[in-house]
């Protein structure tokens, strides 16, 4: 025995409540919290913020107020209205985060469309093989009404989806045309996952068409 062991936890999630694509309820040390984003990974983030706040002497009530006042930042489950289509834009960049986002998306019980924009520039990572560790097989469900891919490496992500058993895929390599494609989606809600530079290109187009205030806002 070397004497090393896991330290005793000072703060822990004691209960998981309702989890949807747009909110999560949970308890930390018996204190109930709600955050305005979905995904188990965001509960981990909230636990980290809570732990630091309590270490600095911030009360649970103040932390809850901060959680409620928190705003979405670009690419982090922000919701953009595109002529009546509710587009949830999520940045993805590695398989662990991707699988967390897939699990988050699947908490939506309603029909939706699913898109993935993939580039392979240095800011994205020039090796796209990480997408093969994504659990795309989970998405082969009747309630996902439409699949589409885009970006410079759209063929890579389309191939991955087809290997997951998804045959009907709309492909749009030109990111300037993605917005028009979204308008024609068969569902009101569209989940759009994107690598970093593809997201910036899309946001530039969204800003030019006045759907958002600016490319980085």
Give the location of each predicted region.
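Short glycine/threonine-rich catalytic loop with a Thr-x-Gly-x-Asp
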Residues: 37-48, 73-75
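Gly/charged, well-structured mid-domain segments that form the phosphate/adenylate-handling core
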Residues: 4, 16-21, 53-92
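A short glycine/serine-rich beta->alpha loop
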Residues: 32-40, 86-88
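Residue-level signal for inorganic ion chemistry
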Residues: 45, 49, 147, 192
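Extended acidic/charged loop-beta regions that coordinate divalent cations
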Residues: 1-32
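Active-site beta-alpha connecting loops in nucleotide-dependent enzymes
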Residues: 73, 91-171, 211-216
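Buried hydrophobic packing segments
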Residues: 46-56, 101
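Glycine/aspartate-rich loop-and-adjacent alpha/beta segment that forms the canonical ThDP
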Residues: 192-217
């Amino acid at each position: 025995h070397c004497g090393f062991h896991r330290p005793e936890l000072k703060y822990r999630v004691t209960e998981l409540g309702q989890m949807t694509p747009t909110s999560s309820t949970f308890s930390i040390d018996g204190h109930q919290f709600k955050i305005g984003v979905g995904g188990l990974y965001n509960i981990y983030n909230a636990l980290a913020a809570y732990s630091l706040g309590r270490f600095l002497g911030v009360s649970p009530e103040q932390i809850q107020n901060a959680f409620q006042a928190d705003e979405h930042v670009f690419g982090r489950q922000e919701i953009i209205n595109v002529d009546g289509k509710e587009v949830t834009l999520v940045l993805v960049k590695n398989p662990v985060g991707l699988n967390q986002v897939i699990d988050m998306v699947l908490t939506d019980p309603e029909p939706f469309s699913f898109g993935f924009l993939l580039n392979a520039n240095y800011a994205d990572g020039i090796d796209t093989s990480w997408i093969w560790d994504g659990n795309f097989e989970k998405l082969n469900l009747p309630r996902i009404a439409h699949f589409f891919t885009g970006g410079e490496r759209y063929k890579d992500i389309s191939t991955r989806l087809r290997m997951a058993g998804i045959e009907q895929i709309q492909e749009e390599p030109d990111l300037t045309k993605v917005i028009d494609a979204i308008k024609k989606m068969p569902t009101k809600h569209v989940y759009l996952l994107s690598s970093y530079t593809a997201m910036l290109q899309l946001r530039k187009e969204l800003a030019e068409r006045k759907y958002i205030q600016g490319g980085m806002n």
